[in-house]
Amino acid sequence: MANGVIPPPGGASPLPQVRVPLEEPPLSPDVEEEDDDLGKTLAVSRFGDLISKPPAWDPEKPSRSYSERDFEFHRHTSHHTHHPLSARLPPPHKLRRLPPTSGRHTRRKRKKEKTSVPPSEGTPPIQEEGGAGVDEEEEEEEEEEGESEAEPVEPPPSGSPPKAKFSIGSDEDDSPGLPGRAAVTKPLPSVGPRTDKSPQHSGSFPSPRARASRLAGEKSRPWSPSASYDLRERLCPGSALGNPGGPEQQVPTDEAEAQMLGSADLDDMKSHRLEDNPGVRRHLVKKPSRTQGGRGSPSGLAPILRRKKKKKKLDRRPHEVFVELNELMLDRSQEPHWRETARWIKFEEDVEEETERWGKPHVASLSFRSLLELRRTIAHGAALLDLEQTTLPGIAHLVVETMIVSDQIRPEDRASVLRTLLLKHSHPNDDKDSGFFPRNPSSSSMNSVLGNHHPTPSHGPDGAVPTMADDLGEPAPLWPHDPDAKEKPLHMPGGDSHRGKSLKLLEKIPEDAEATVVLVGCVPFLEQPAAAFVRLNEAVLLESVLEVPVPVRFLFVMLGPSHTSTDYHELGRSIATLMSDKLFHEAAYQADDRQDLLSAISEFLDGSIVIPPSEVEGRDLLRSVAAFQRELLRKRREREQTKVEMTTRGGYTAPGKELSLELGGSEATPEDDPLLRTGSIFGGLVRDVRRRYPYYPSDLRDALHSQCVAAVLFIYFAALSPAITFGGLLGEKTEGLMGVSELIVSTAVLGVLFSLLGAQPLLVVGFSGPLLVFEEAFFKFCRAQDLEYLTGRVWVGLWLVVFVLALVAAEGSFLVRYISPFTQEIFAFLISLIFIYETFYKLYKVFTEHPLLPFYPPEGALEGSLEAGLEPNGSALPPTEGPRGPRNQPNTALLSLILMLGTFFIAFFLRKFRNSRFLGGKARRIIGDFGIPISILVMVLVDYSITDTYTQKLTVPTGLSVTSPDKRSWFIPPLGSARPFPPWMMVAAAVPALLVLILIFMETQITALIVSQKARRLLKGSGFHLDLLLIGSLGGLCGLFGLPWLTAATVRSVTHVNALTVMRTAIAPGDKPQIQEVREQRVTGVLIASLVGLSIVMGAVLRRIPLAVLFGIFLYMGVTSLSGIQLSQRLLLILMPAKHHPEQPYVTKVKTWRMHLFTCIQLGCIALLWVVKSTAASLAFPFLLLLTVPLRHCLLPRLFQDRELQALDSEDAEPNFDEDGQDEYNELHMPV
């Protein structure tokens, strides 16, 4: 049998057998006196006196009635089959009594002094695990003495009657035992389950006198060697109870004692003696070193040691959190069930009652009273930490038993509370996922749930918590007024329950997250609130409980009557918000007892904000709350940092603090700063090569992804549009010496070479506004000095290579750290003003050449002029193929104005649409990113549809040819083409080379600095020295071939990095997006540059683009560049009252007049640069721009304090990847 006892014929239950004691040799008087005292104290007669008076019957409390079904269940239940007490007796070699010695006599006296209950006060308790106060070492010494000084037992005289002794819990004698199992005789009458207060128990047992005579008769049987035994010998290790076929079975006591106790007491004894309930605080009892499993031989300890080795180490490492609040509600059929009403990943999301959909994530606002009630609830409720259960019924069973032990609920409410905890769970997404056919989860009655799912106790996998269907009788009604409660569906963990899970929500939950389930509700059968906080030993997947399959680690249960003042909903929100707080849930993982949880609540209250109970009208009144909260969080982090430093001081790390160190407690290893000087010539360049080139194979492998293909198509249009725009304007500025063809070829060649050799291949090289301004200034200078413009650029390029080599050799890239936003804003604001001015100046020239006249030339004259210089649809021929375009054309000015404004407004509207709330985030982002190509395409179609109005078109040659073949070729002679180039200019070209180096250095290095921000999570590093050397050296080659100089384009480079950025999907709703990785590779840059170069074959298409459309793009770039500059925002504050100023650091931390003074200084620098740019000395404007750097670091600290400069000139811009956030123009202080 499973119980290890051979049943007699007929299937009767075994009856314990008792042997007749043998006659013992006379002992000393002291020993006999002690034996007599203990015999009187623990005699059977005292038990008879205790049970002779039955407890009074209370007629008000209902008693349970038992039927034949109850008795049959009791007879055939395995855990009610009791073993004979003789089976717990020690082996035969322990039957010998030791003679008294002086040492033993002294130890007996010492043990008698430790006895807490005198014999006259009552019956001593039966110890759970070893006798209280018994010293382990003394017992081992007694064993050794007993084996060395044992005397043979003499048989009693034949004529003397046997002396019956029956003492329980003897502290003196070693317990005798039997060499084998007791023989089975007749079955013991079974006792049905009953409660302590049932009046039926009085007739179930014989009288004390009859019981005593029966026991005496049993003890007089000849096969009993001794009647003196010790209850301590019945102790066995808890791990030995898990073996179904082992000698140690789950039997709480023997039949004799079972007849004295009720079924409730037997169940309690069984739970107390045989189960190990984690989280339940018990009195510490010193365990004796002797156990029955290891008494006979060392092999008995092997199973115990094996199980100890298999015990897993507690996982105290905090995980990410997912909290779900379930409230007890009634459905449409008035059936109770658990309904999900809120959830937390980081912020709170509530279910809207009317629409049954999730609301927007928000910061949870809690009432101060609910937090105090929660603290009081945890202080007085049940706290089960490190509970070793893996099923919901097992957890619920131990929670209910703990509530009963802590006097939170009555024993008769056990069934109702357990049924309530096991009710089915429903979620808002259940009906949505199932469509027209709602999902019907598997349900079962209480009997099937408890019969099929036995929670596993901590002492062994095979030992199950005793569950018995009839222990609860017929299923008690969950609600007292509901007679059909037994048919209500309960939670069935094993069913198919996750059909309605939300995959989108599951993506937002981190992979290693562990869930917290909060169950709160009102029940009518409780008289007072009952609560329990449970932390499982390890996270387990409780199916059908959560909306998504996330393992559960914490549970909080709160049930109570409705007539109390407790708001269960707010209390559930409070504990859920606490568990979603980072510091509190870390403390919950590391808590050792209840006090740690209470301390964590106090820490949470220290960082909380209390808002007065007044009506708040408008968000402006709550502006101070956010700032105050940031201050509290800062102080909280400082306290945590101080604690971490104290725990790590001296090399000691407190237990449970390893994660805090990983999260920022310990300093990270210093990173390889690419701008750090080595002190050697070309030292920075060598470090860049060693840092970046080892990643070259991965730069090719990482491009094998579909995201790279999408990035290539997007950045191609983003790079082609500026190339066409700046190429057309450059042709206007240089009179056709350089145009679209040269700029496209330069972008393609330099882009491919830089992508293959550069240290940061994510940079996009291209033409920019500052270089356009410089080219125009240098062209005017050469015309004024009667010099060849292209030949002068050759010498400027050669000097540029020399200066770049000298700068890289001296590791001068570190100077970029001194270029603050003060200089960047001046630079960007100046270029934006130039763009806007040039746009309207070009439009003014169109109105001058084609004025609005009341009378135009005759039709024939107009046709003759059109035939002389126009292609069909009014496309202007290249300068070599005919005269300049016609003048005084009707409607040309108006159409040019419409095309320019139409292009600007379409591109600007699509940019605003990108940050709007229409459509999805990805769709808006795609439309917004392609705003410029879309606007160009739309307005080209508009111009193409109007055939009778002339507009000036973009000049693009046919095939791979220069813009003006009659003026130049692809190679520029360094000594001059038409006439010799003056030698003095060969040397003087060093000055413009130095100026163009300033522009290239500032744009390239600032762009590389922006791309290399830590927030962008680039892992392969960058190389400022190598990138500058490549761009400068390639600039020298551009001069020889008559190609425009290029630099790292800020907006296009940042857009390229953003297109290759992979965002984390496991982001809590309402939280800002986080970068998972960036696909750093070289292939996309090569493909983008190649596609731009191949665009030269689209000459027929490019010749259809009107110049007015390019003016609109020029205007768009100028206006959008101003939106991200703090200078433009502070400029508007001059015209705004102080009460309407925004809550920005440069407003709140600086006085208004001093803020305006800083703005005026910047405007003065811009005005000076504009004046220089407008005069003949326009070539020197990069040098004046460079002078703003020493102005910021030398003069401004004398006018402003450090804290003011920190607020006015701080680089606090971070990359924004929110779908509803700002674009690249708002993040950057650099010109387009």
UniProtKB/Swiss-Prot annotation:
On whether Hydrolase is a keyword of this UniProt record, the answer is no
Catalytic reaction(s) noted:
hydrogencarbonate(in) + chloride(out) = hydrogencarbonate(out) + chloride(in)
Q: Where along the chain is composition biased (Basic and acidic residues)?
A: 58-75, 267-279, 481-499
Keywords attached to this Swiss-Prot or TrEMBL record, sorted alphabetically, are: Anion exchange, Antiport, Cell membrane, Ion transport, Lipoprotein, Membrane, Methylation, Palmitate, Phosphoprotein, Transmembrane, Transmembrane helix, Transport
Positions where Omega-N-methylarginine occurs in the chain: R295
Q: Where is the lipid attached (S-palmitoyl cysteine)?
A: C1165
Write the protein's name: Anion exchange protein 3
Biological source species:
Plecturocebus moloch (Dusky titi monkey)
